[in-house]
Amino acid sequence: MKKHLLPLALLLSGISPAQALDVGDISSFMNSDSSTLSKTIKNSTDSGRLINIRLERLSSPLDDGQVIAMDKPDELLLTPASLLLPAQASEVIRFFYKGPADEKERYYRIVWFDQALSDAQRDNANRSAVATASARIGTILVVAPRQANYHFQYANGSLTNTGNATLRILAYGPCLKAANGKECKENYYLMPGKSRRFTRVDTADNKGRVALWQGDKFIPVK
């Protein structure tokens, strides 16, 4: 598939990906029965970092998603939005959803601006911390509908999400092609209205298994 759900945008200037701030999972999910979510970020480098965080609502988490207006200014809040993170330190960032309690799934981009700090001599008597390298990291937050309807259809190795909330789907068992080995596994996120065919696992085999997650609930399909 050309379009992948939940892409990561990592634009760097003067810093390599290995040195960038560790923001955890590329994609995060806030289930329908929760209005808060926490993400732990870590500075694994040997210098302090200045972190600024911004939120954008997206029409879709796919490659063609566009930034759109939020339904209200305080739809999604976070704290802290700016912090100084010492070397080898961690911090918990908390997100709070205060938007409409309807049947619509919402997508947000969390933009992390990460700047490394070092001491720079301004004059003989004064030293100050200045940014010496920077990175812009984008991750995705999916807020499930407050009124979630989980429905799906499965036939001939293909799953269709007929509900209104993204599903995490998986298949495991004998490989469809011998070249891939004996046992294979596939994991995908399936948005509402989308279908996905498993291409590595032989789901027609009696030992082939298909399952999915509806929020925190595990559902065997085959």
UniProtKB/Swiss-Prot annotation:
Function: Part of the ecpRABCDE operon, which encodes the E.coli common pilus (ECP). ECP is found in both commensal and pathogenic strains and plays a dual role in early-stage biofilm development and host cell recognition.
Family: Belongs to the EcpB/EcpE family.
InterPro entries reported for this sequence: EcpB_C, Ig-like_fold, PapD-like_sf
Signal peptide coordinates: 1-20
Keyword vocabulary terms for this entry: Chaperone, Fimbrium biogenesis, Signal
Source species: Escherichia coli O7:K1 (strain IAI39 / ExPEC)
Protein's name in the database: Probable fimbrial chaperone EcpB
Induction section of the entry: Negatively regulated by H-NS. Positively regulated by IHF and EcpR.
Underlying gene: ecpB
Pfam families from the UniProt entry: EcpB_C
